[in-house]
Amino acid sequence: METSNQRLALQDAMVFLGAIASGTEQAIGESANSIAYLAGVNLGKKMSEGVAHTSDILQALDSTREFLAKNDYLWLFEPFKPHDQLSVIQEDEDGTHVMLVFRDCMIRQSLFRFGHTQKGSLCNMMFGFFAGALQNIMGRESSLEIVHAGENACYKKLTIRRPL
């Protein structure tokens, strides 16, 4: 019974979160994306305090996944190697890249539950979260770009920028 009540409470919170995102985007337009991004950066930095530092991108992602799970955040993601790549990790002049698949995402579920579109302010909050967390863990700037946003999963490109 407790699990059922917890699920109902979570679903109510998801609808509320979707409504806030929709209303904020309508009220202030594109600025909502920047505000949500900065909020995500702050959250990512705060939640990743005390996490061991590493220069290994896969270890940093494992650490991120671990502290998300410890805090009951439902962002299940994993590195993905496209068939035409030799390795999960790719390097170029911009930095280090890893493709990520987000199979279960509380942001996506909130948006669907409310009936709001993806790629808005809540997705930008996620980008900020990863930027803040990885800045703490790796000491480098990063970006997370949506390649595909779908009903069952999202496909994103994580770039860890080269130090200046």
Task: List the predicted regions and their residue ranges.
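Mixed-charge, glycine-accented linear interaction segment located at domain edges/termini
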Residues: C123, F130-A133
